[in-house]
């Protein structure tokens, strides 16, 4: 939390601590989102989609604005990914969104851009795959897409003025190389 972007997320962990540490951070963030969205409503006896969306929303907000770290957390992407896995109706949209994130990362090198695009892709794909039915999940996925734009607003500004840091593709490719 004192190095790199000072953000508490997998991207900064990768840049400052390496791939294994970053993978650990990502797994914890995804599981945190999934656990709170899937199990908390079960434990309190209210397993409605609305209850799950409130639990998911709360876990994302808790990640981005943690009380114990003076309300300065990560950007919520890993945690949001975990919350989406708690909804079977979103599996395909989430997979397509994740693939769009990967493609954006590999083509442009911009993690934040990939995150924003993936949020919009999940929303768009879910709306069309649900025959444009508006329900609690539609609003939840809309919240996530808008929230990704808000939490990445500084990245967007830097992209527009040409000063955004690219994820070092060499680092990413070296991770997959055999040693």
Segment roles from a protein language model:
Residues 14-17, 40-44, 58, 77-108, ...:
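Interfacial segments of multi-pass membrane proteins
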Residues 19-42, 52-64, 76-78:
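Alpha-helical membrane segments and adjacent membrane-interface helices in multi-pass membrane proteins
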Residues 34, 38, 42-43, 65-68, ...:
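Structural signature of transmembrane alpha-helix termini at the membrane-water interface
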Residues 24, 60-71, 104-112:
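Transmembrane alpha-helix interface/packing and boundary motifs in multi-pass membrane proteins
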Residues 1-10, 68-81, 110-118:
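Short, non-helical or kinked segments that cap or interrupt transmembrane helices
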Residues 23, 52-57, 91-99, 116-117, ...:
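Hydrophobic alpha-helical transmembrane segments
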Residues 1-21, 157-179:
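Cytosolic, membrane-interface loops and tails of multi-pass inner-membrane proteins
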